[in-house]
């Protein structure tokens, strides 16, 4: 617990990080396709994407991360550049990317978990919840200095979680 507290104590208020999750789609059928490893490997040759690209549980999904921005505008600038590069990379490899919330017809049973220790552990521990997690979304992380302050902010947000969920489910 001490190490978690140290991380929060070293944080900077109101820094922002953005993560976008994209479905990897076959260009002809628009069905999910298991091409994460290929895209991730190709991204290693790009100095921006090498740091920005990450896996997110299933092989038909790819994520880009802005890194820590000093403010929202800074994070958006970084994310836009990485997104443009990732879309170009996907087009060069003959796949489409989409942020669809969930995929409308690709069966969750056909999705494969990325083969790493971490994701094998997630699949083992969460099973059905992990298997059904075929979602593609955007996350915004906001830095709050101090563990106690971060908990206090979460406590204050709890009464409006329903409204935040409604806004995010558009």
Show which residues each predicted segment covers:
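Terminal catalytic/cofactor-binding subdomain
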Residues: 1-129, 134-136
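An acidic/histidine-cluster motif and surrounding catalytic segment
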Residues: 140
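Loop-rich catalytic cores of soluble enzymes, especially ATP-dependent carboxylate-amine ligases
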Residues: 115, 144-170
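Short strand->helix junction
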Residues: 69-72, 143, 147
